[in-house]
A protein has these predicted regions:
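Catalytic-core regions of core metabolic enzymes
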Residues: 1-691
Length: 691
C-alpha cells in the first residue's frame, strides 16, 4: 500500500506565489492573478513577472529572488524554457507544492520528457510535490483557492481529472442539479502527483462526501485501483472512465484476451475495488447526486408512489428491467396505506391520482408507511411532486413541508427515496429543498431507477490469498493435451479423451472413449480450431473416426499452414446446460484477471462477460454473474434447471490461482465450459505462455 502524501501545502497554503502574473484576463496567468488578488486577504500573495509594476494592489516582482518571504505554493505559468529556473527558485523560497500549468514537456517529445523527469527529481529531493505540468490547476472551495480560472459551484464532491476542460461540463451539470465541488485537481501529465494521490487525499477530506475522477489511462493502473479501493472503504467513489471504444488494443490469442481489453479491464477492476463506474458526464453527475446521500439499498424491493396511472406503469416496467423487484405489500402495510388513497387500491405501484393542496400530506403518509414496512427497501416517487407549487403557488410552502417530512422519514429508516419530477429542470424551491435534504431528484424515470441500482453495491473484496496449485513444468507452447492435464490437476472435470496420431489410432480411440465423440485438431500454433475447420462433432463409429482424421488433417494443415501433432478424440458431453467461457489473463497494467462469459465459441459476438482481479473469492464471482445480461439463462429460464454458478466461479478462481503460480502463463482459457445444475465440464482448453 502506497502511503498517502501530504497535500496540505497544495490545497491549504498559507502563502502563494504566481510566476507569470499579468493583468490580461484573456491569459491563464491573468485568470489566476485575478483570483489570487481577489483573495489576498486569506493568505500572503506574491506576484512575479518580467514587466514588474503592481497588480490588485500588490507589487509585482521582476524576479523570484526578489520575493523576501517564504511561500507554501508556487504556481508557474511561463513558457516551457523558463519553467526549470522558476522551479529551482521557487524551491529555494521554501515552496512545498508547485503547480505547472505550462505544456511542452512529457506529452510532446522525448526531450520534453527528460526535462519533466529532471523537474520531478528536483522537486522530490526538496521534499515538495508537483501538480502537472500541462494541467489546468486546482480548486479548494473552503479556502477559496482557485488556480483553475473558471468558477465552480459549492458542494460536496472532490473531483480529479485527466481532462481539465471536461471539468467545466461536469461543473455546469452539477450546478443544474443543485450540486457542486469541494475540491478539484487537473493532474495533467501526472509527472509527480497522480490521480491515485488525489483520490487518497480526497478520501480523507472531511468536507467531501463523494470522491470523483475522470480517467483515460492511469499512470500506474495497479496503484490507481488500490487508491480507489482504499477510498471506497471510506466514502463513495465515482469514476468516469473514458476511452471505452479505443481501437488500439493488440490482437489477442484467445476469446479471453479479446474480451478483456484494456478499457474493459479498467472498468472491471474499478468496480471490483468498490467504485461506481460511468461512461458519460450526465451519468457521473447522477451518480454523485445519489451517492452523496450516504444511503444504500438493503435488498432490491421497491415501492412506488405515483400521482397518475401512466407514471406508475412506466416506473414499474423500469424497475423490473433494471433487475430490481417490485415490493409485495403485506396485509398490514396495505391497511396502513388505504386511508391515504380514498377509493384507490393499496397496490404497488400506489396511484395517488388527482392530488391537490388538500392531500399533499398524503404523499408523506404513503412514503412513510412504505419506508417503515419490512418488505420495502426503497421508495420511488414519480410524477408531479416537486411541481405543485409551480402550478398552484399557494401550495408551494406546504409542498416544501411535505418534502422535508419525506426526507426525515428516509433518514429515520435509513432507506432511500428518489424522486422523478416533471418539474426537475425548473430547479424550484421544492426541488432545491429535496436535494438539500438528501433526496435526489431526476427528470426521467430511468435516471431515478438507475440511481437505486447504484445504491445496491456489493461488498469490497480484500485480503484474499491465492490457493496453491500442483507443481508442474509447462512446455513453451502447450497444446490441448498438456493444457487439459494441467487443468485436470486443479480438479476441473473433462470428458474421457485420447490423442490419435493416425487414422487407425483415431478408430481405436473412439472405441475407448465411447460415441458420440468430438474430434479436435491439436497443434500449439493452432489458436482457433473452429475457424480452421479443426472441430468435428457427433463422430459415431470407428470408420467415421478414421475417415475424419484423414480429411481433417489435410484440411487444417492446408488452411492454417501448421503441422498437426495429432487429433484429439473425446466423448461428447450430454446436451443441456449453458456453454460458458472461463479464462484468466495476465493484464500488463493490472496483473492477473479472470473472466466468465456466456456463449462458448460465440462469446465475442454476444459480448456478455464479467471480469475480476485475482486472487478473489468464488462467492464474489458468483454474485458478479448476476450482472450478466444472460443471467436468466443461468438462473433457469423457461423451466430449465439453474446452473451451479458457484462451481463455475470456483473453476475461475482455480484458473486465477494457476496463472498466479505460473508467471510464464499469459492466458489460460476453458471454452466452452458446459455448466449444469450439478456441476461443470470443460470441453476445450488452452494455455498460452509468454514469449
Amino acid at each position: 500500500m502506497i502511503q498517502r502524501r501530504d497535500l496540505t501545502p497544495l490545497f491549504e497554503p498559507r502563502s502563494v506565489l504566481l510566476v507569470g502574473a499579468t493583468a490580461d484576463t484573456l491569459k491563464w496567468g491573468g485568470w489566476v492573478s485575478k483570483s489570487f488578488g481577489d483573495h489576498q486577504h486569506l493568505r500572503d500573495t506574491h506576484f512575479v513577472s518580467l514587466r514588474g509594476g503592481e497588480l490588485y494592489g500588490l507589487p509585482v516582482r521582476t524576479s523570484i529572488a526578489d520575493v523576501a518571504a517564504p511561500v507554501d505554493l508556487a504556481v508557474i505559468v511561463v513558457p516551457a524554457p523558463g519553467v526549470p529556473d522558476a522551479v529551482t527558485q521557487s524551491l529555494a523560497l521554501g515552496a512545498k507544492a508547485l503547480v505547472i500549468i505550462t505544456s511542452g514537456f512529457g506529452e510532446t517529445s522525448a526531450e520534453g520528457l527528460a526535462v519533466q523527469e529532471a523537474l520531478v527529481d528536483e522537486v522530490r529531493a526538496a521534499g515538495a510535490v508537483l501538480l502537472g505540468p500541462n494541467c489546468l490547476g486546482l480548486y479548494d472551495d473552503l479556502g477559496q483557492l482557485n488556480v483553475y480560472g473558471g468558477t465552480f459551484p459549492s458542494g460536496d464532491l472532490a473531483f480529479a481529472t485527466q481532462s481539465g476542460n471536461l471539468a467545466l461540463e461536469v461543473a455546469l451539470l452539477l450546478e443544474r442539479s443543485g450540486q457542486g465541488l469541494t475540491r478539484f485537481a487537473s493532474v495533467g501529465n501526472q509527472a509527480d502527483l497522480t490521480l491515485a494521490d488525489m483520490i487518497r487525499d480526497f478520501a480523507h477530506h472531511e468536507a467531501s462526501r463523494v470522491v470523483g475522477a475522470y480517467v483515460e489511462s492511469p499512470r500506474d493502473g495497479a496503484d490507481f485501483a488500490d487508491a480507489v479501493r482504499e477510498a471506497a472503504a471510506i466514502k463513495p467513489v465515482v469514476v468516469f472512465a473514458g476511452g471505452r471504444t479505443a481501437a488500439g488494443a493488440h490482437a489477442a490469442a484467445s476469446h479471453t484476451g479479446n474480451l478483456a481489453a484494456e478499457s474493459r479491464v479498467l472498468r472491471a477492476i474499478l468496480r471490483d475495488a468498490g467504485a461506481v463506474v460511468v461512461d458519460t458526464p450526465g451519468a457521473f453527475v447522477d451518480a454523485v447526486s445519489t451517492l452523496r446521500t450516504g444511503k444504500t439499498l438493503g435488498r432490491r424491493r421497491i415501492g412506488i408512489v405515483a400521482d397518475g396511472g401512466g407514471h406508475g406503469v412506466v416506473s414499474s416496467d423500469t424497475v423490473i428491467e433494471a433487475g430490481l423487484e417490485m415490493a409485495t405489500f403485506s396485509a398490514a402495510t396495505r391497511d396502513a396505506l388505504q386511508p391515504f388513497l380514498k377509493l384507490n387500491a393499496p397496490n404497488n405501484p400506489v396511484d395517488l391520482a388527482g392530488a391537490d393542496a388538500s392531500v399533499l400530506w398524503h404523499f408523506h403518509g404513503l412514503v412513510d408507511t412504505m419506508l417503515r414496512a419490512e418488505e420495502v427497501d426503497a421508495v420511488v416517487m414519480t410524477g408531479y411532486f416537486g411541481g405543485y407549487g409551480a402550478y398552484h403557488p399557494e401550495s408551494g410552502p406546504l409542498e416544501m413541508e411535505v418534502a422535508e417530512a419525506i426526507a426525515r422519514s428516509s433518514d429515520e429508516t435509513g432507506k432511500p427515496v428518489v424522486v422523478q419530477s416533471m418539474e426537475e429542470a425548473s430547479g424550484n424551491d421544492t426541488i432545491r429543498r429535496l436535494r438539500e435534504v438528501d433526496v435526489p431528484v431526476f427528470s426521467r424515470i430511468e435516471q431515478a431507477i438507475d440511481a437505486l441500482v447504484l445504491l445496491d453495491r456489493p461488498p469490497i473484496v480484500q485480503g484474499v490469498a491465492p490457493a496453491g496449485v500442483p507443481d508442474r513444468t509447462l512446455g513453451d507452447r502447450p497444446a490441448y493435451p498438456e493444457a487439459r492435464a494441467a487443468l485436470a490437476e486443479l480438479g476441473i472435470e473433462f470428458p474421457p479423451g485420447q490423442l490419435a496420431t493416425s487414422a487407425e489410432e483415431a478408430a481405436a480411440a473412439l472405441d475407448a472413449v465411447g460415441a458420440p465423440a468430438a474430434m479436435k485438431a491439436v497443434a500449439a500454433e493452432l489458436l482457433h480450431k473452429t475457424d480452421a475447420g479443426g472441430v468435428v462433432l457427433g463422430v459415431s463409429t470407428p470408420a467415421v473416426a478414421a475417415e475424419t482424421f484423414t480429411t481433417m488433417k489435410h484440411r487444417v494443415e492446408a488452411a492454417a499452414g501448421v503441422a498437426l501433432d495429432g487429433i484429439w478424440v473425446e466423448r461428447m458431453a450430454p446436451s443441456g446446460g449453458v456453454d460458458l467461457v472461463v479464462g484468466a489473463r495476465r493484464d500488463p497494467t493490472f496483473g492477473p484477471v479472470v473472466l466468465i462469459g456466456v456463449g462458448g465459441v460465440f462469446v465475442e459476438i454476444l459480448d456478455d462477460a464479467v471480469i475480476a482481479p485475482v486472487p478473489t473469492e468464488a462467492a464474489h464471482l458468483a454474485a458478479l454473474l448476476r450482472t450478466l445480461r444472460a443471467y436468466p439463462l443461468l438462473a433457469g429460464a423457461r423451466g430449465q434447471e439453474p446452473v451451479d454458478c458457484l462451481r463455475v466461479a470456483e473453476i475461475a478462481v482455480r484458473l486465477g490461482d494457476l496463472i498466479i503460480a505460473h508467471p510464464e502463463i499469459s492466458e489460460v482459457e476453458i471454452n466452452p465450459l458446459r455448466a449444469t445444475a450439478t456441476g461443470a465440464t470443460a470441453l476445450d482448453a488452452r494455455i498460452v505462455t509468454l514469449g
